[in-house]
Amino acid sequence: MTAPLPRGTGAAPRARDGFARLVHAEWTKLRTVRRWLLTLVGAVLVTVLVSLFSALGSSSETARGGGPPGPTGADGRPVLDGFSFAYRTLTGDGTVTARVSVPEGDGRGTPDWAKAGLLVKESTRPGADYAALMVTARHGVRLQSAFTRDVAGSAVPPGGLRWLRLTRDGARVTGYESADGRAWHEVGTVDLDGPDSKGPAPHAVPAGFFVTSPDIQSREREFGSASVDQRPTVSTARFDRVRLDGRARPERWRHVGVGGDPRRDAGELRPSGSGFTLSGSGDIAPTTPPNDLAVMALDGVQLGLVLVAAVGVLFVTAEYRRGMIRTTLALSPRRGRVLLAKAVVIGAVSFAAGLVATFTAYLVSADPLRGDDDPPLFGDISLADGPMLRALVGSAAVLALIAVLALGLGALLRGTAAAIAVVVVVFVLPLILLGTLPLDLAHLLQRFTPVAGFAVQGTLPRHDQVATVCLPEEGCYPQGPWTGLLTLAGYAAVVLGAALWRLRRRDA
């Protein structure tokens, strides 16, 4: 009878110890080949120097026109706050109700985010906090506040009508919607004394109905040629059964164009049967800085990856070229574990080198990029912010995944030149072409090729309620940062898996 194995012994621990020895052996190989270490150091230097020179050579212009700065929200960030507003001053609690039509544009088109609805605002000063319940041209009923908060209600078809109601109770404003004016459903509640407000909500506030219509943006590219079109629009909506319950003054509705932009239509309020027709132009929305500090500060990563990939390829092809792979495999009959050990070592070392490269590149590039612009060109993002840390650490992870992918290619092709050429075609060539291809094709490359990993560098906030054009040359990727990084990780896993399959079934 076989005696039971003592606790803590057995095949599994020995296997783990064996793999640890393989990892140590591969690490010893890497650190004793001076050319490989020097190449990794070169990758760090290239990343840092290219990023620095790019920052020193970059120039950005801000359009000030000698006028006053634009409005800012309660958090001090620039916002858009221009719309056509018909209001009365509500002194205390109260309710405003109306049946609102979906806004329609003039002959220049209707933006998807054209808005018509009810509004309670701390004042008519641009940037003041507000609660707005609206019908949009393509996105149904929405309750918005603080320029970034957006709560979806029901869908409303083009040409449709919806009853809307805003009820003020102290600093709390609650939005309701109804299809028939009898059965009401709550959309959400806004606290005008919340953490995003500049102070206590005033006792007397403007309350009424509004219309706004954002610019229509379009950019077309056809293999090097580009056209940019951004034009203001005017939208109109009808408001029936308008009613303001509560103590209010004056007796008549007062019309004002909030924002006062002379380049825009101030809008017009016209009585129409039992209600009003109101037209307007502008937007109530957050603004996004025109440039992404992380993307520009990490410009050198796109060249540094070539050297990192070269080390990944050489880490396996050098043994094939010199015949050492037979000795390596003879010491470990389970061939797959050898390649996995190499992947662990090259991935970890490349990640460490990437951290040094990305953090140093940011530290030397951020100040030249920021310059002395006022307002700041890149918003107020700093190294301590989560998105910036994600961009820096994520870029190091991109370099590590590229090294692992290159290792897999080297094991598959068993030729240094061929494997490095594939890396250049897969990564460098698409990054060069993204700025010249038609947008739809460029976005496909960004989504479904390994360059998707660079989406992790994006730090600009995205707001679903703001229509924007995503341009690859500005570092914009159509997918989220983690989705892009997972796409690259998937490619690395597939290539490494294919290399493992081939290594197990063919002679070295």
Region annotations inferred by a language model:
Residues L40, R326, L339, I420-A421:
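Hydrophobic/aromatic positions within or immediately flanking transmembrane alpha-helices
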Residues V41-G42, A419-P430, Q446-V451:
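Central hydrophobic cores of alpha-helical transmembrane segments
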Residues A15-D292, V313-V316:
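Extracellular glycan-recognition regions
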Residues T2-R16, V41-G76, L80-G82, L143-F147, ...:
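Secretory targeting signals
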Residues G312-G336, A343:
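Transmembrane helix boundary and interhelical loop/hinge segments in multi-pass membrane proteins
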Residues L503-A508:
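Short cytosolic juxtamembrane segments of multi-pass membrane proteins
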